[in-house]
A protein has these predicted regions:
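C-terminal segment of classical bacterial N-terminal signal peptides
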Residues: 19-28
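N-terminal extracellular ligand-recognition/capping segment immediately after the signal peptide
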Residues: 38-39, 49-83, 127-130, 382, ...
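Surface-exposed loop/turn motifs in large extracellular/passenger domains
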Residues: 63-70, 88-103, 113-132, 136-153, ...
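C-terminal low-complexity, Ser/Thr- and acidic/Pro-rich disordered "stalk" regions positioned immediately N-terminal
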Residues: 460-495
Length: 525
């Protein structure tokens, strides 16, 4: 027992010594350091951990493979001094701002190059450049809150994917297969030949952010791109807001564009084109649109080799009706406020009219808008078809509307004066002193409606009434005077005898009473 106790004591002492030694061991793998020059910055990146700029630094640095680094720009600027970038990332890098990373004026030099093995998260900071891409991504990158500004109209602000030659791919040869991922959650992005170019093998996802350009599209997609939000606007010489292109379904440039949401404003505040086609390629690829707001023209799609299919969204151009998916249509809720793409079932149930415009059909919420559209676009009035008729009910005596209407689908009969729909509650007018006589087509109450009734236009139905006769007082009868006569003749003989007999009986009774009183007095005396 004693030996066992000594053995346990020795082990406990050894364990305590190991803990003490560990406490004094250096811990530099995740050191939080502040750096003021290129050498110290590179050393900190080699070690990994949290690194903070303490001054403006000129120098191109690299995050090694296998290292995890959080770089806080701390309001300072890191400027490249050699190609291919101010920061080359082969590891896992998170950048926080404020501060700036500048690709400088060197050719083929970006602010940041994310290599195929790199994972980059740009959560802040401003990234600038003037001679090449501002951001070149061949790995996995997420941008949430950063700003990217391109001063060079000859290059895109962001290039996601392979260009196809080593010079534009930072010395890397394009593989036969790769997945290059860029996710943009939020931020501000501007300038360049394109603001964002989704290149070979690129998979682009945009859920938010502001994208502006003056010389080219906001987004050029060559492979796979999905837009679920964001504000996209271009101006001046831009060919369109969104450009798409493809080299075929089996190539690294599939040209598959999906737009579910977002706001898109064409050049010159909406007078230019929404879509454009990437230069080169074998086709314009496919664009599947299920939502979003589009201020711009679609007329140029006739000349583009882009297969566009629309199942949702709002558009200022009625030409969207040419590109709707089967089962969907374009509908104008209010003339001058654009066209919404809805299901044909929804349009048939809610629209008042539709207009055949060439090979397409456009629905309108009211008949007047449909007629105006036909007139403005030189469409024969016979191509305007009213789908529903509104019946308004009016008091035929006062010309005051009852406030109730009925919407009747074209071709359907009205079996009663229904409210809201033909199956709704029946309106039965009542007026004191009058009897309701039925509904009429005219205010003169000469054309009575016979139900079932099929309306052929919007119309008013007038309630007819007949005035009741004055009420008759039953006590007055027929107003003839009735008189009564009082009898004054003498009573008959039989009546007089009865009266005399009654008097005799009364006298006899009185005499008997007097006699009784007299007897009582004698006894008392």
């Amino acid at each position: 027992m004693e030996k066992r106790g000594m053995r346990y004591g020795f082990v406990a002492m050894l364990f305590s010594m190991l803990i003490a030694l560990a406490a004094f061991a250096p811990s530099t793998a995740f050191a939080d350091v502040t750096v003021n020059n290129k050498t110290d910055l590179q050393q900190a990146l080699d070690n990994g951990g949290e690194v903070t700029l303490g001054d403006n630094i000129t120098g191109s640095v690299t995050v090694p493979s296998g290292k995890t680094v959080t770089l806080n720009l701390n309001g300072y600027t890191l400027t490249a001094d050699q190609k291919y970038a101010a920061i080359t990332n082969n590891g896992t890098l998170t950048i926080a701002g404020p501060g700036t990373v500048d690709g400088s004026s060197l050719s083929q030099t970006a602010a940041i190059y994310n290599a195929p093995s790199g994972v980059a998260n740009l959560n802040g900071g401003t990234f600038t450049g003037s001679k090449w891409y501002v951001i070149k991504n061949l790995g996995t990158m997420t941008i949430d809150g950063a700003s990217v500004a391109q001063d060079d109209a000859g290059s895109s602000a962001i290039d996601n994917g392979y260009f196809g030659n080593a010079g534009n791919d930072c010395g890397v040869s394009e593989p036969s297969f790769a997945t290059v991922s860029l996710t943009i959650i939020n931020g501000s992005f501007s300038g360049g030949m394109n603001v964002v170019k989704n290149d070979d093998f690129g998979v682009l996802s945009i859920t938010g952010g502001t994208f502006t350009n003056t010389d080219g599209p906001a987004v050029l997609n060559w492979n796979k791109a999905t837009i679920d939000g964001g504000d996209f606007s271009v101006n001046n010489s831009a060919s369109g807001v969104i450009a798409n292109g493809s080299y075929g379904a089996n190539s690294p440039d599939k040209g598959e564009l999906i737009i579910n949401a977002g706001t898109f404003t064409a050049p010159n505040n909406g007078s230019g084109n929404i879509f454009a086609q990437g230069q080169g390629g074998t086709s314009g690829g496919t664009a599947v649109v299920s939502g979003g707001s589009y201020n711009g023209s679609l007329d140029n799609l006739n000349n583009l080799n882009v297969d566009v299919e629309v199942s949702g969204g709002s558009f200022t151009d009625a030409a969207v009706a040419k590109y709707v998916k089967s089962g969907n249509v374009a509908m104008s809720a209010n003339q001058g406020n654009g066209f919404q793409v809805v299901s044909e079932e929804t349009a048939e149930a809610n629209a008042a009219a539709k207009v055949q415009n060439g090979d397409s059909v456009i629905y309108f919420a009211n008949i007047e808008d449909a007629k105006k559209f036909a007139e403005d676009n030189h469409i024969d009035p016979s191509f305007v078809e009213q789908l529903h008729f509104v019946i308004t009910y009016v008091d035929g005596l006062t010309d005051a509307a009852y406030g109730s209407t009925c919407t009747v689908p074209a071709g359907q009969k009205l079996t009663k004066a229904a409210i809201d729909t033909p199956d709704g509650e029946e309106l039965v007018p009542a007026k004191e002193g009058y009897t309701f006589t039925g509904w009429y087509l005219d205010k003169e109450l000469t054309q009575k409606v016979t139900f079932p009734f099929e309306p052929s236009s919007d119309m008013e139905l007038y309630a007819g009434f007949s005035k009741n006769d004055p009420a008759v007082n039953p006590s007055q009868g027929d107003n003839k005077t009735t008189t009564t006569t009082t009898k004054t003749s003498s009573a008959k003989t039989g009546d007089n005898l009865a009266l005399f007999g009654g008097l005799l009986a009364l006298i006899a009774a009185a005499g008997a009473t007097t006699a009784v009183v007299a007897v009582r007095r004698r006894k008392s005396e």
